[in-house]
Amino acid sequence: MTKNNTNRHYSLRKLKTGTASVAVALTVLGAGLVVNTNEVSAVATRSQTDTLEKVQERADKFEIENNTLKLKNSDLSFNNKALKDHNDELTEELSNAKEKLRKNDKSLSEKASKIQELEARKADLEKALEGAMNFSTADSAKIKTLEAEKAALAARKADLEKALEGAMNFSTADSAKIKTLEAEKAALEARQAELEKALEGAMNFSTADSAKIKTLEAEKAALAARKADLEKALEGAMNFSTADSAKIKTLEAEKAALEARQAELEKALEGAMNFSTADSAKIKTLEAEKAALEAEKADLEHQSQVLNANRQSLRRDLDASREAKKQLEAEHQKLEEQNKISEASRQSLRRDLDASREAKKQLEAEHQKLEEQNKISEASRQSLRRDLDASREAKKQVEKALEEANSKLAALEKLNKELEESKKLTEKEKAELQAKLEAEAKALKEKLAKQAEELAKLRAGKASDSQTPDAKPGNKAVPGKGQAPQAGTKPNQNKAPMKETKRQLPSTGETANPFFTAAALTVMATAGVAAVVKRKEEN
């Protein structure tokens, strides 16, 4: 009866030992899962907080820069508007100055043409006045003298004609002398023509013509002397031959022509003598007009100088306004370029700000998502914590059961010694005991199969519970990370006493199973390999 109880108790111990090993392995896995979950959630929370702070700081910086650029843009717009208004005012002043300058130029051109007309009229009046003033009493006396000389020449001409009428028998020896006289006659005719021209121009005598008159008087004296010589020669030429009669006729024809020209000259002299008191009044009127024209000319010249000064001043103002307009246009162009650059920068900053806001929204969404995942992870962690506490409680119970089993094992060893002493059993008792042991072994195998099924169900349930937080994106918990070596310390510590339990059963001689069964070792090895592989992937 004692043997049966002992075998039954040992079989129960063996079953409890396998269950405890599986529970310890599951405890190790749960502890690693909890630690890894805490680490992942803490790292994710810190990274999310840092990213949100950086995004918020960058968004604030972009907002400040955007406000600064808006202020600069408003200042540039105000300055640009002021410059445009100033430019419009200068343009209007420039157009007014141009219009005024155009009117002044037109007035100057009109006055210049009027001055030219007055100067031409003045020149004509001066010429007429000079010609009219040169006929003085001395000139009248000189004209009378010329008339007297003309009368003397006419008398002398009559004497010569009489001499020519009597000179019908010129000799051949005097032909050369006649030719000489003809040449001198031609020279006299030429000189007479010059005198006629001088008489024709007697209306415009000036101071310079007085010298010419003196020259003519000297030539006239020379001609008178030459005339005397010719008269003497004619007195000696009384024996012209008959062959020279044709020549004489020609000379007579020329004489008639000279007489006709002399009559014309006399008429011209008579016209030159008709300067009366009416002409003197006309001369005074012309002098008064000349003085008025000179005064008007001086006034016009003064106005022209004033207009020229005004025109030059307007020209300088116009040049200054043009230069100022160019400078303003350059500044306006520069401001427009700066405005374009600032606008481009503002748009770029606006795009960056929009991008940062969009990134901030995405990060906030991710943060919200991570918070939800964190909540789920926290719930899973709490659930795992509860499971871990339960597994630790089970571990304590297992350790307590292990202590009880060790004490029972000591009792069994004691019984084993007693059984060794009672080896002298009969074959019948051995057969009965063998049958009982086989029956108990069969029952034990069936019970182990049931426990294996329950253990498989328990593993499937734990796997489904551990996969529930992993279904969410971003929650990557590694089971058993960093905890496998710690969990494995207790089995190493219990190794020594377990070696002592590897003894044979007293009745059948079978070797007793250790505390860590093959299933428990397989679970622990799988967990360790998974933890190492996951750690390599993270590194």
Curated annotation (Swiss-Prot):
Residue ranges of D repeats: 435-440, 441-446, 449-454, 456-461
Key words, A-Z: Cell wall, Coiled coil, Peptidoglycan-anchor, Phagocytosis, Repeat, Secreted, Signal, Virulence
Segments annotated as C repeats: 298-332, 333-367, 368-402
Disordered: annotated segments: 297-401, 456-511
Residue spans of biased composition, Basic and acidic residues class: 314-340, 349-375, 384-401
Record flagged with keyword Lyase: no
Span(s) of short sequence motif LPXTG sorting signal: 505-509
Protein name per UniProt: M protein, serotype 24
Organism this protein belongs to: Streptococcus pyogenes
Protein encoded by which gene: emm24
